[in-house]
Amino acid sequence: MLIKNNDLIFSSVDKIKYSARRGMLELDIILAPYLNNCYMHEDLANKKLFVEFLTSEDSDMFDWLFKGVTPPQRYQQLIDKIIKEKKKFNQTKLK
């Protein structure tokens, strides 16, 4: 997916949230804390990487996020952040 650095998608959480809607509820749930708490604070390169990540197949994302399958190297830090943010959400919101 070709993404321009000046693409307005990077500045709109609503557009990203819409793009992040997946066909699997589990993915929606794990991506939401990252989107709500981290995305807008990321630099442009990381925002661009997340938008690229969203073009992945749901089955691949599920494997990387839930089954521990090794993702492409460029996504490893992002996936670690997504999982960390979900754990933080669980600790604070699900008590």
UniProtKB/Swiss-Prot annotation:
Where does the record place it? Cytoplasm
Q: What is its main location?
A: cytoplasm
The record's section on SUPFAM superfamilies has: YgfY-like (SSF109910)
Q: Which GO terms describe its cellular component?
A: cytoplasm
Q: Name one Pfam family in it.
A: Sdh5
- UniProt keyword terms in alphabetical order: Chaperone, Cytoplasm
Biological-process GO terms, alphabetical: succinate metabolic process
InterPro entries reported for this sequence: SDH, SDH_sf, SdhE_FAD_assembly_factor
Of which family is this protein a member?
Answer: Belongs to the SdhE FAD assembly factor family.
Summary of the function given for this chain in its UniProt record: An FAD assembly protein, which accelerates covalent attachment of the cofactor into other proteins. Plays an essential role in the assembly of succinate dehydrogenase (SDH, respiratory complex II), an enzyme complex that is a component of both the tricarboxylic acid cycle and the electron transport chain, and which couples the oxidation of succinate to fumarate with the reduction of ubiquinone (coenzyme Q) to ubiquinol. Required for flavinylation (covalent attachment of FAD) of the flavoprotein subunit SdhA of SDH and other flavinylated proteins as well.
The protein here is known as FAD assembly factor SdhE
Organism per entry = Francisella tularensis subsp. tularensis (strain SCHU S4 / Schu 4)
Q: Gene name, please?
A: sdhE
